[in-house]
């Protein structure tokens, strides 16, 4: 099976007119720029080698020097070039003059009663579409006894307008680059003390089994990953590199609302686990909950799942099903779900609906959720009920929305026009 390419070259994209994709400016890997110098954190090997070539490192040395920097950035978590003890002073000076090891800015950190952490991250500005301020995204760390899961974002905002999802109320600003996606993992390891020789901050909830604090990645944050598939594939490649960040691809899950044409690309080039935001068993209801269903209806979606590269009993597809009171939680819908998934190696994650300001839905009663789970389980499918985590800090499934989008309407309009941007950002609402 092919592995993810770490080169910066891309196959030619075919022009399309998908009505669900809002065209946005491309963001190059050098997007993380601070004080006029691009950061090297989060780059692919190919991009890192290009940066060395750009400052005059001889071609015969580039492979070796790339390996050195790769190790310091992705294994040791170096925050300065000075820390790189096996890199010569001359090269250090060149690197310091041209580049940084900056991470995205941590604007805020919220810690839930259950130990979940949510970070609001600000990326350096990449152009006028970022309003000369830098886009903001959220990522979430969810600790458990046997794992630590980081939920990462792939876009700033989202185009899909799923009616039960808070992120769907935030318009799409742009795709995140592969570098910006990977940098979320680097920031999490910084904040958790998850690099060699470090210890977590006092009071931090982390796995107790001796594993890495961040052991799993889920692309379940802001955005539709498969509308940014090139950068997601590259980010998975960097995250799973055995000589770097070192996460197992079987511990990296990409969740999609059903962008069917990109399933094969994801399965072959990223070899990641697949999760489907299903949430309904009838097209008329899914059209309302997940409007993308009008383009790729349930039958088309499930056929693509049956053909997903590498799917097997050992690599099951996860189907996510949010439990909405009186909407999709009946016994008959549980039985229809079982019928639809027949022949697909699968497990079903039942997700109690997480409320957010302005939502018109309610969470199913606990007894109803248990009954739904029982029907699915008795039919032979694992049907765990996802424990809500981080609800008190709006960090749970479907609750993410970057703080920029919580600006008062007038302030946001001023920002979009480039008027008084610095002053406007003091007007962020706390809700």
Swiss-Prot record:
Reactions that this protein is recorded to catalyse: adenosine(2503) in 23S rRNA + 2 reduced [2Fe-2S]-[ferredoxin] + 2 S-adenosyl-L-methionine = 2-methyladenosine(2503) in 23S rRNA + 5'-deoxyadenosine + L-methionine + 2 oxidized [2Fe-2S]-[ferredoxin] + S-adenosyl-L-homocysteine; adenosine(37) in tRNA + 2 reduced [2Fe-2S]-[ferredoxin] + 2 S-adenosyl-L-methionine = 2-methyladenosine(37) in tRNA + 5'-deoxyadenosine + L-methionine + 2 oxidized [2Fe-2S]-[ferredoxin] + S-adenosyl-L-homocysteine
Active site: 138 (proton acceptor), 397 (s-methylcysteine intermediate)
GO MF term list: 4 iron, 4 sulfur cluster binding; metal ion binding; rRNA (adenine(2503)-C2-)-methyltransferase activity; rRNA binding; tRNA (adenine(37)-C2)-methyltransferase activity; tRNA binding
Highest taxon in the source lineage: Bacteria
Positions of the UniProt region annotated as Disordered: 1-26
Entry binding sites for [4Fe-4S] cluster: 158, 162, 165
Binding note for cofactor: Binds 1 [4Fe-4S] cluster. The cluster is coordinated with 3 cysteines and an exchangeable S-adenosyl-L-methionine.
Residues that, per the record, bind S-adenosyl-L-methionine: 223-224, 255, 277-279, 354
Residues of the Radical SAM core domain: 144-394
UniProt signal peptide: none
Annotated localization: Cytoplasm
Biased composition (Basic and acidic residues): 9-26
Cofactor(s) it depends on: [4Fe-4S] cluster
SUPFAM superfamilies: Radical SAM enzymes (SSF102114)
Disulphides: 151-397
Classification via PANTHER family: 23S RRNA METHYLTRANSFERASE, RADICAL SAM CORE DOMAIN-CONTAINING PROTEIN
Purpose: Specifically methylates position 2 of adenine 2503 in 23S rRNA and position 2 of adenine 37 in tRNAs. m2A2503 modification seems to play a crucial role in the proofreading step occurring at the peptidyl transferase center and thus would serve to optimize ribosomal fidelity.
Protein name: Dual-specificity RNA methyltransferase RlmN
Taxonomic source organism: Methylobacterium sp. (strain 4-46)
Lineage: Bacteria, Pseudomonadati, Pseudomonadota, Alphaproteobacteria, Hyphomicrobiales
């Amino acid at each position: 099976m092919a592995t993810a390419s770490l080169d910066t070259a891309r196959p030619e994209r075919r022009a399309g007119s998908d009505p669900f994709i809002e065209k946005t400016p491309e963001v190059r890997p050098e997007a993380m720029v601070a004080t006029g110098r691009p950061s090297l954190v989060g780059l692919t090997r190919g991009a890192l080698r290009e940066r060395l070539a750009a400052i005059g490192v001889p071609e015969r040395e580039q492979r070796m020097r790339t390996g050195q920097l790769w190790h310091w950035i992705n294994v040791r978590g170096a925050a300065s070039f000075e820390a790189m003890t096996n890199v010569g002073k001359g090269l250090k000076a060149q690197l310091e003059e041209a580049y940084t090891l900056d991470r995205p800015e941590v604007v805020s950190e919220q810690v839930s009663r259950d130990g979940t952490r949510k970070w609001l991250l600000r990326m350096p500005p990449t152009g006028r579409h970022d309003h000369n301020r830098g886009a903001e995204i959220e990522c979430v760390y969810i600790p458990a006894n046997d794992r630590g899961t980081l939920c990462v974002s792939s876009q700033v905002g989202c185009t899909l307008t799923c009616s039960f999802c808070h992120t769907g109320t935030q318009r799409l600003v742009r795709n995140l680059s592969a570098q910006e996606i990977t940098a979320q993992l680097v920031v999490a390891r910084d904040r958790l003390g998850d690099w060699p020789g470090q210890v977590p901050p006092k009071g931090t909830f982390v796995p107790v089994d001796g594993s890495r604090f961040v052991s799993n990645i889920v692309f379940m944050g802001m955005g539709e990953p498969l509308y940014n598939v090139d950068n997601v594939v590259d980010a998975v490649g960097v995250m799973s590199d055995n000589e770097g960040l070192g996460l197992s691809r079987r511990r990296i899950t990409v969740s999609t609302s059903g962008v069917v044409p990109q399933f094969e690309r994801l399965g072959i080039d990223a070899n990641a686990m697949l999760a489907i935001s299903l949430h309904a068993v009838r097209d008329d209801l899914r059209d309302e909950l997940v409007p993308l269903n009008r383009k790729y209806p349930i039958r088309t979606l499930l056929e693509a799942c049956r053909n997903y590269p590498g799917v097997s009993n050992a690599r099951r597809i996860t189907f996510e099903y949010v439990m909405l009171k009186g909407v999709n939680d009946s016994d008959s819908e549980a039985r229809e779900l079982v019928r639809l998934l027949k022949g697909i190696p699968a497990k079903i994650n039942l997700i109690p609906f997480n409320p957010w300001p302005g939502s018109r839905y309610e969470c199913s009663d606990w007894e109803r959720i248990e009954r739904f789970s029982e029907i699915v389980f008795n039919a032979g499918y694992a049907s765990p009920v996802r424990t809500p985590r981080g609800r008190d800090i709006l960090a749970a499934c479907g609750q993410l929305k970057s703080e920029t989008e919580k600006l008062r309407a007038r302030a946001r309009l001023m920002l979009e026009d480039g008027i008084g941007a610095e002053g406007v950002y003091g007007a962020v609402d706390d809700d």
